[in-house]
Curated annotation (Swiss-Prot):
Primary location recorded for the protein, binned into one broad class: secreted
GO molecular function: lyase activity; metal ion binding; toxin activity
Protein name: Dermonecrotic toxin LgSicTox-beta-LOXN1/LOXN7
Cellular compartments annotated: Secreted
Length: 36
């Protein structure tokens, strides 16, 4: 990781990763078993 990155870049990266995890969890929860 590059510590020289601006704080907003790190915040955006963290938000993006969190959003992706939640999105994947939601998709896996809502899809039928045969689609997983």
């Amino acid at each position: 990781a590059d510590n020289r990155r601006p704080i907003w870049v790190m915040l955006l990266s963290s938000y993006w990763q969190d959003g992706n995890s939640l999105g994947v969890d939601a998709i896996m929860t809502n899809y039928p078993e045969d689609v997983k």
